[in-house]
Amino acid sequence: IAAVIILLIALLVVAIGVKVSSDRRARNLGLDGTKSSEVIASKLVDNAENSSVRIYVERGVIADEKHYSIEMTISANTRTIRVLRGYENIEEKSEGLSNNLEAYRAFLKALEKNDFTEIREDTSGFEFRAACPTERSYRFSLMEGSSETFDRWFTFCDGKRFGEYGGKVNATFSLFKNQFPNYGMITRGVSF
């Protein structure tokens, strides 16, 4: 009996050691959902061939018929802008442009300079649309292959910042907007 108890204790110790080691590995690789901004930032340019970045901007909470949002997605091969109507994101207009790896790498480096992957703590408890319902809201995403590895939001009202996105919002928005020579024409009639 003593041998069985010692064997069970030894197995338990090994199992706990494996779990702790696995948790540390996941945290270091960012697989546990708590990726540090340093880990994500280093991956922006390093994984340019297999990634895309996206910004989604929407108007405050208003009638479905007047609710518009803009989504811009950039990858090594394409740049896409979509104007979406209503809360169900019905596509009204879109434009797809080609891209190349060097242009995309330059874009990612510019995003890094503007803290695209910076994460800030938001203890407000609000969600994306609830924090500042009459103001513009932003979502920033990084996709690696088919996996979304970074998704943070931001809004500002009453002198307060809300959301987990810690980057430079206006500069980042301008960088995305400048990827589309026809931005003004595509978004004509969309009021924020």
Regions found by a protein language model. Give the residues of each.
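Short, surface-exposed, polar/charged, turn-prone segments marking secondary-structure boundaries
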Residues: R82-V83, K109-E112, G125, V169-A171
